[in-house]
Amino acid sequence: MKFFALFIYRPVATILLSVAITLCGILGFRMLPVAPLPQVDFPVIMVSASLPGASPETMASSVATPLERSLGRIAGVSEMTSSSSLGSTRIILQFDFDRDINGAARDVQAAINAAQSLLPSGMPSRPTYRKANPSDAPIMILTLTSDTYSQGELYDFASTQLAPTISQIDGVGDVDVGGSSLPAVRVGLNPQALFNQGVSLDDVRTAISNANVRKPQGALEDGTHRWQIQTNDELKTAAEYQPLIIHYNNGGAVRLGDVATVTDSVQDVRNAGMTNAKPAILLMIRKLPEANIIQTVDSIRAKLPELQETIPAAIDLQIAQDRSPTIRASLEEVEQTLIISVALVILVVFLFLRSGRATIIPAVAVPVSLIGTFAAMYLCGFSLNNLSLMALTIATGFVVDDAIVVLENIARHLEAGMKPLQAALQGTREVGFTVLSMSLSLVAVFLPLLLMGGLPGRLLREFAVTLSVAIGISLLVSLTLTPMMCGWMLKASKPREQKRLRGFGRMLVALQQGYGKSLKWVLNHTRLVGVVLLGTIALNIWLYISIPKTFFPEQDTGVLMGGIQADQSISFQAMRGKLQDFMKIIRDDPAVDNVTGFTGGSRVNSGMMFITLKPRDERSETAQQIIDRLRVKLAKEPGANLFLMAVQDIRVGGRQSNASYQYTLLSDDLAALREWEPKIRKKLATLPELADVNSDQQDNGAEMNLVYDRDTMARLGIDVQAANSLLNNAFGQRQISTIYQPMNQYKVVMEVDPRYTQDISALEKMFVINNEGKAIPLSYFAKWQPANAPLSVNHQGLSAASTISFNLPTGKSLSDASAAIDRAMTQLGVPSTVRGSFAGTAQVFQETMNSQVILIIAAIATVYIVLGILYESYVHPLTILSTLPSAGVGALLALELFNAPFSLIALIGIMLLIGIVKKNAIMMVDFALEAQRHGNLTPQEAIFQACLLRFRPIMMTTLAALFGALPLVLSGGDGSELRQPLGITIVGGLVMSQLLTLYTTPVVYLFFDRLRLRFSRKPKQTVTE
């Protein structure tokens, strides 16, 4: 009692304490970063290696495998996947959450160095690594377009000047430049002209290499001067290479221009990028795993004017895509929802108390509690994100509860004629333990969440801590500031009611009287109530088993990502046409604002598209509805598929796939994997629970298989190395020399003229110069025929792997899809040599599903322990926890009604309900125990009186929590798909629990009291103290 008096009789100190809490909160708010969600990105590092012209199988065996063996020894690697395609290998390392990415990067570099001696000697450069997840959607895409400069020149500006500068910005993990390649001098050889002149392709390569040399020449000195020797040993442009003498034939000089077309072009002509039907170079910027997306985007935007000045005026630098506007809009929506919740909660208090003076007290307590929380959030390193702001929105109903309980009890004493300061002291003393019990038991709900590991635990930690801190500050405020304000502001008389509110007051009295009559009937028919309670428990179990489940609500971030997958034998020219066709279909959709895309590189039959939708207030459809509409139009394009998915703020794993969810097949037997993957993929494609089923296994690419006659080769004086060198020189875009410029290095690329690379009969024109100097046609010692070959080889760990990706059709959940996949695998009878498992987000969903029930049980057990300690009783906590089944039924039925799957957000709602609905029982049990202890009442009389006395605060606290959550249900706009499941769960649970627990709690209280007396050694002791 002295504790309460200390604050009630020292108003200045109490006010200054509250002001200090508020000022600290304001300061913390100003320094908090902004993010869409808590930081939950796994540390991911991508290792890249190249060997131009090498087949996917060669890259997998000679490059990927040695690197994987070395990288696999690094501590903390949770997953390692690789993909090898034509001339390129990419290895993705995903680390444990607690692994520092900078330390991991050092280990990766050491592992690359250790594997260097095992890698092919012909690699043009050492493997490199980047601290970014390639499967993440870019946080920003910049485009370069120009009517004056070529694509190669634009690419040079982008990769040489812009990308390095952007990479140095804090938070940027990777800048991927696409749409073309670096400028180069391209030598397109004419096989027939070479044959006529008796010049081999190796002769041309050697001549070019020897003619472009950058070596130190030394210096000359005499007694007084020193001269540096400089020669014209370098050739820079196509015009300088054109007259190069490469051979003499019958005394005549054969120049390069006689046997080849020499042009200033690009290193790889099989690349294309576009933005809104215009050729463009794309800079796709990804953030570091630990970086804040908003701060990173703001830093890039601040740098753009400076970047624009570094490139010519004829080049247009534009932002094609920016993830931050929808994130900011979503957070603004949550902030508005928070303000509405506060207003509704205060309105509830005003309606019940019917006094403006009394309403001011919780109207002050709520903002002090919420604002003070920002200081703790800053100290904990949190951010202002959708989850932390939703925690504050929900906290609105909680923090006002404590103030309501104290205020209502003090007001009751004032109405009885007690003096204000005495009423404040007495009222606070009576409910101080109740408020403490409610707050501690509510915080106890979140202890299992704080101990939960993995991504779900990291995701929910900010929510749990933010809400717990708000409740803790609310507890302090309700026991200090609230009674002080009551003692000094309220008067010892009944509050004056406005005429408009008298009707509401009479309605409350009528409700209370009606409740009293119905409660008397219930207490005389306890068995019926017991059956209802058991029925809610059974219904809970059935609803939880049957309700569709998913990991995280499907977000509408305003950004779509699309993966193009064409026939495996498609040419680059045809693939570029498919990209243009798909872009036109999407660009014509009224909901689309911007489209960028690219194709080419090592994966000739694939491409990527990034689509920015119009703001939510300018379109009526959600992202998923737009995808459903576009899917019908895109399906009409022959020979290729475009798979669209909405970009999410959470994406798990480093696999680049064409859909949101993945199912990976593993095998140590590559032949078995290639046999069963098509069967499984075709089966999954028929399932109605899945959409956009596709696979990264591509083993039906067109190949021209050459078979050497080694005996003939030996007789003709030709070795295999010479024959392979011929093919590489002719068709491998071989980089044969380097051009050194002040800002960059460029290549001289040699191959046969494009008209020959696009014609199979060009092999007939190929020849090799044997050891006698004679030109021997390729057809003399080799035969060729079309065959199938893999376009990519994929590994997970050191096993061969194939990942099947899929999206969810409208109305289907991830639990439906996972169950259907498990049934399909069983029906197919897949052998044990082929193992299937969910990957990425689907894998985390499986793990979360397995732990959900355990988490709920742990939360209930924690609350029971806390209540047992507070009440020094094994029985009364069970009475209080009997309120939970009805809340669970209401929450699950509400989700079913709104056709919302049970997600991680809904799980938060269930956890919150465990803390919310027991408050009613705590208020009843506390007053019943007090009445038995000091009023000499029977248990039935005590609980009946407690129910009637606490009816008004129970209704106030429940409606305050309900109205605090209601704006989440009704909210629209950006981010509403995250807020609504939480609001639906809480509102549904509160409505059902309020209808039932007002009756079930008294019955359970009497049941346990009789049970306690039956087993008690001291039957006369009626109250457990």
From Swiss-Prot:
Coiled-coil spans in chain: none
Keywords: Cell inner membrane, Cell membrane, Membrane, Transmembrane, Transmembrane helix, Transport
GO cellular component, one term: plasma membrane
GO molecular function: xenobiotic transmembrane transporter activity
Record bears the keyword Cytoplasm: no
Annotated membrane topology: Multi-pass membrane protein
Annotated transmembrane regions: 3-23, 333-353, 360-380, 387-407, 431-451, 463-483, 528-548, 853-873, 875-895, 897-917, 953-973, 984-1004
Alphabetical list of Gene3D superfamilies matching this protein: Multidrug efflux transporter AcrB pore domain (3.30.70.1440), Multidrug efflux transporter AcrB pore domain like (3.30.70.1320), Multidrug efflux transporter AcrB TolC docking domain, DN and DC subdomains (3.30.2090.10), Multidrug efflux transporter AcrB transmembrane domain (1.20.1640.10)
Annotated function: The MdtABC tripartite complex confers resistance against novobiocin and deoxycholate.
Family: Belongs to the resistance-nodulation-cell division (RND) (TC 2.A.6) family. MdtC subfamily.
Name of the molecule in the record: Multidrug resistance protein MdtC
Source species of the chain: Escherichia fergusonii (strain ATCC 35469 / DSM 13698 / CCUG 18766 / IAM 14443 / JCM 21226 / LMG 7866 / NBRC 102419 / NCTC 12128 / CDC 0568-73)
Higher taxonomy: Bacteria, Pseudomonadati, Pseudomonadota, Gammaproteobacteria, Enterobacterales
